[in-house]
A protein has these predicted regions:
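Long, hydrophobic alpha-helical segments that serve as membrane-spanning/inserting helices
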Residues: 1-11, 32-242, 266
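A generic fold-level signal
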Residues: 12-14, 300
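Hydrophobic membrane-insertion alpha-helices, especially the h-region
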Residues: 14-29
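Peripheral terminal and inter-domain segments
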Residues: 230-333
Length: 333
């Protein structure tokens, strides 16, 4: 009798212990779920801020690109002696060619806040962090250095003209005539325009274009992660009509002449190309494509037009960008 009672009590105690352990484990699991949920909510909020900053930055970058395209055209006209006194007289905007610049510094508050909360970043988004670091550290810092050099050249030109040419700071008819004569006929001014074009139009604006083109697929990635349903901003490249009906034709793996494998995939209604990287991370940013017409796409990182190639059965078998021909290696039967 006593042995039976002891056995029952022992089994009961073991059962109680098991129930307590299960309760503790469930409580820990629930706590982990809650903590993960809080972390994911915070991470999403941080990404929303990064997304909004990048959207603004890309819009500003686009405006700078357009501005320096005009400056490039103007510099070429000056260097080639195509502008007369009357050209300067009739368009005052031309008078300030080498004396002004339009800078650009990125809005990195959202990015910095994200980097200060790395404990909230899920492991599956490590590649995203690599891409953001490239955008906001490598590319943005190169752009900043280039802007510093460019700004110093412009400020030096302003100082030199202010000290040597009285008409520079005057706006009367006599001073204006001297200004126009100098800009139209002085050979040194042409050299100054060359310097401006090199460090401003060709250098600084080149880094701005790199930031913009690299940021386009990154913006789409962020948009997908935060599940943003708003229309893309107006500056974003547009696909030609009919994209949805043919986009699946282009998806898949491709092989370059030097042996690199490329993957064309779709993200938020656009095609992008990235290298099929073996390892933890891909250090080469993806390239956004926008459709010009059926089988023709603009590569927004290189500026080239990709022409997809089809076989007799109308299947896509590769593409050419005018320099290289890339072969599709997963053509379905």
């Amino acid at each position: 009798m006593e042995k039976n009672k002891t056995g029952k009590y022992f089994k009961y105690a073991i059962g109680e212990i098991v129930l307590v352990m299960i309760g503790i484990l469930l409580a820990l699991q629930v706590n982990t779920w809650n903590e993960n949920k809080k972390s994911n909510i915070k991470f999403n909020k941080l990404l929303v801020n990064v997304f909004n900053d990048l959207k603004i930055d890309l819009e500003i970058a686009q405006s700078r690109i357009d501005f320096y395209k005009y400056k490039d055209s103007l510099a070429n006209d000056i260097i080639n002696g195509k502008l007369s006194v009357s050209d300067y007289k009739n368009n005052p905007r031309r008078n300030s060619m080498i004396f002004g610049y339009w800078g650009f510094r990125v809005s990195n508050m959202g990015y910095n806040a994200l980097m200060q909360n790395t404990e909230n970043i899920p492991s599956e988004y490590e590649q995203l962090i690599v891409d953001l670091n490239r955008q906001y550290i490598v590319t943005a810092e190169r752009m900043e250095i280039s802007l510093t050099v460019f700004a110093s050249i412009v400020k030096s030109a302003r100082t030199r003209y202010a000290l040597n040419f009285p008409w520079y700071s005057q706006n009367d008819s006599v001073s204006n005539e001297k200004r126009w004569q100098h800009l139209a006929n002085n050979p040194i001014y042409k050299n100054e325009a060359r310097l401006y074009r090199r460090y401003g139009v060709r250098n600084f604006s080149g880094f701005v274009a790199g930031f913009y083109n690299q940021g386009l697929p990154l913006l789409l990635t962020l948009k997908a992660i935060i599940n943003d349903t708003n229309p893309l901003p107006s500056f974003f490249p547009k696909n030609a009509d009919g994209f949805d009906s043919v986009k699946s034709d282009y998806l898949g793996k491709y092989l370059t002449p030097n042996g690199d494998e490329l993957i064309v995939n779709e993200i938020k209604g656009y095609l992008s190309i990235y290298i099929d990287h073996i390892g933890d991370f891909n250090d080469i940013p993806p390239m956004l494509l926008s459709m010009i017409s059926k089988d023709k796409f603009k590569n927004h990182r290189t500026g080239r037009t990709l022409s997809f190639i089809r076989d007799e059965s109308n299947k896509v078998i590769g593409w050419s960008d005018g320099t290289d021909t890339v072969k599709k290696i997963d053509v379905n039967d």
